[in-house]
């Protein structure tokens, strides 16, 4: 992909556009409603997340990318002026739809787009401003992230049956995910368990958060590359990584957790209560 490094780095005062991706269902959360509409402290996660963006010194409106059949978002009140785009099946497809909507609305390719998860309502305002300020000085963008603090284990799947033949290698998680029939295909396997294979060096490991902030035109190009080559990505920064384009890491707060599983509600509720108490 042709680099526009020189053009982008000179534009250190770009216009800022905000996008919240809210088209997913949150299957791991397991609720009957989309998790962005979970109520905490009297408001939905989506409303909380928009309110955090509204506190930024750089954001004055927000694009919400929602599912085709979403009938809830437009019934809510938000802390920013809102406009909408229809998302796709995968997160990156929703972001791509949002980028196209922004460009069609007249945004410049050198502008910055701030992409935030609806399920991260506790991001501190100063972190939002910090990652935007960092992205202003980068040719491609910057993201919030935290250094990994816990010990990381790589795992494998195997049985505890001692009669398992030595020539049968343990099943990997990828094998089980893509070929579940293998779970019962190896002789001697009666109960499968997860085991630690090795410890991963965490000295250069970071946990990605949002907001993630990118040059709009560059993001459009890398997402087109993802589409063309049918790549699997879990966040926007990984699209840039496929092309070895540098994305700056900005240390964020550990308060900025993502609501993924039901028991995350306990921690997230406590964080929001503490944050509200500190400003009241």
Swiss-Prot record:
Gene from which this protein is expressed: ispD
Site positions for Transition state stabilizer: 28, 35
Domain of life: Bacteria
Protein family according to the UniProt entry: Belongs to the IspD/TarI cytidylyltransferase family. IspD subfamily.
Entry keywords, A to Z: Isoprene biosynthesis, Nucleotidyltransferase, Transferase
Catalytic activity reported: 2-C-methyl-D-erythritol 4-phosphate + CTP + H(+) = 4-CDP-2-C-methyl-D-erythritol + diphosphate
GO MF terms, alphabetically ordered: 2-C-methyl-D-erythritol 4-phosphate cytidylyltransferase activity
Site (Positions MEP for the nucleophilic attack): 202, 258
Protein name, per record: 2-C-methyl-D-erythritol 4-phosphate cytidylyltransferase
Coiled-coil annotated residue ranges, if any: none
Pathway participation: Isoprenoid biosynthesis; isopentenyl diphosphate biosynthesis via DXP pathway; isopentenyl diphosphate from 1-deoxy-D-xylulose 5-phosphate: step 2/6
GO process terms (BP): isopentenyl diphosphate biosynthetic process, methylerythritol 4-phosphate pathway
Pfam short name (any one): IspD
Enzyme class: transferase
Function: Catalyzes the formation of 4-diphosphocytidyl-2-C-methyl-D-erythritol from CTP and 2-C-methyl-D-erythritol 4-phosphate (MEP).
Enzyme Commission no: 2.7.7.60
Organism: Psychrobacter cryohalolentis (strain ATCC BAA-1226 / DSM 17306 / VKM B-2378 / K5)
HAMAP family: IspD
Xref: InterPro entries: IspD, IspD/TarI, IspD/TarI_cytidylyltransf_bact, ISPD_synthase_CS, Nucleotide-diphossugar_trans
């Amino acid at each position: 992909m042709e680099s526009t490094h020189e053009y982008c780095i000179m534009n250190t005062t770009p216009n800022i556009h905000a996008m919240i991706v809210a088209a997913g269902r949150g299957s791991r959360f397991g609720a009957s409603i989309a998790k962005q509409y979970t109520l905490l402290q009297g408001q939905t996660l989506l409303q909380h997340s928009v309110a955090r963006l509204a506190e930024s010194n750089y954001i004055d409106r927000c694009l919400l990318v929602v599912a085709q059949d979403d009938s809830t978002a437009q019934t809510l009140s938000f802390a920013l002026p809102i406009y909408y785009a229809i998302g796709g099946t995968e997160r990156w497809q929703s972001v791509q739809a949002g980028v196209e909507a922004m460009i069609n609305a007249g945004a410049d390719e050198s502008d910055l787009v701030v992409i935030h998860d609806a399920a991260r309502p506790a991001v501190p305002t100063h972190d939002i401003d910090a990652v935007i300020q960092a992205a202003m000085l980068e040719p491609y963008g910057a993201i919030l992230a935290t250094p990994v603090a816990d010990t990381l284990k790589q795992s494998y799947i195997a049985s505890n049956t001692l009669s398992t033949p030595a020539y049968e290698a343990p099943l990997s998680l990828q094998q089980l995910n893509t070929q579940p029939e293998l779970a019962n295909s190896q002789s001697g396997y009666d109960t499968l368990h997860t085991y630690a294979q090795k410890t991963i060096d965490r000295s250069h490991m970071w946990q990605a958060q949002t907001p993630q902030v990118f040059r709009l035109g560059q993001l459009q190009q890398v997402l087109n590359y993802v589409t063309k080559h049918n790549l699997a990505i879990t966040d926007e920064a990984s699209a840039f990584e496929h092309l070895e384009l540098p994305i700056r890491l900005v240390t964020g707060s550990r308060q900025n957790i993502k609501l993924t599983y039901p028991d995350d509600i306990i921690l997230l509720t406590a964080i929001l209560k503490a944050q509200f108490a500190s400003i009241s």
